[in-house]
Design a protein with these regions (language model features):
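Enzymes that bind and transform nitrogen-containing heteroaromatic metabolites
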Residues: 1-174
Length: 174
């Protein structure tokens, strides 16, 4: 999501009243949504949409009032996912309640993917394998989990498909 957010600093507000830690719904009837997990409020959105998808930012209660005011001024919806850490199960309930979202396409990196896997919130895994090998050390994996991980998940193959360029598409039920 970072390529869609600016590098500008969040403007300081003139008003010093505390903004309540309540979800802000700028738009609830969009065709589709782009959801960003940003616990500390670092993403400075250029607009409230990414390629036509309304932006929803998931934040923690520790973000600044200046950041909340910034999101509101941009028309970016935000949901609180917890005090300091994000409770992904809670966030999914809120996404369904406020936006009618029942299914997600998770396009995260290893940390986001690992967090959803550790919370047992992934039901299907879709993997594209490109015929490229770089041999890099320290490359992120598909699932990176910092916290104590749970048991390994057994996957059941749903389908295999060969695509253009010798790419293979694997789909698994988790």
């Amino acid at each position: 999501m970072e390529p869609y957010a600016g590098k500008a600093k969040v403007p300081r507000r003139k008003a010093k009243l505390r903004i309540p830690r309540e979800d802000f719904i700028a738009e609830s009837d969009a065709e589709s949504y782009a959801i960003a997990i940003d616990p500390s409020g670092k993403l400075t959105w250029k607009s409230n949409a990414i390629e036509g998808e309304h932006v929803i930012t998931v934040i923690s209660e520790r973000v600044s009032d200046d950041y909340l005011a910034f999101l509101q001024s941009k028309g970016v919806s935000y949901l609180f996912g917890g005090r300091a850490d994000i409770d992904l199960s809670k966030v999914l309930v809120k996404l369904r309640k406020h936006f009618g979202i029942r299914k997600l396409l998770l396009e995260g990196g290893g940390r986001i993917n690992g967090s959803f896997l550790a919370a047992d919130l992934i039901d299907e895994l879709s993997v594209l394998i490109a015929p490229v090998a770089d041999g890099s050390i320290g490359t992120p994996t598909l699932f990176d989990v910092e916290a104590q991980r749970g048991p390994a998940r057994n996957l059941r193959l749903i389908s295999v498909q060969k695509l253009k360029g010798d790419v293979v598409w694997l789909r698994y039920k988790i």
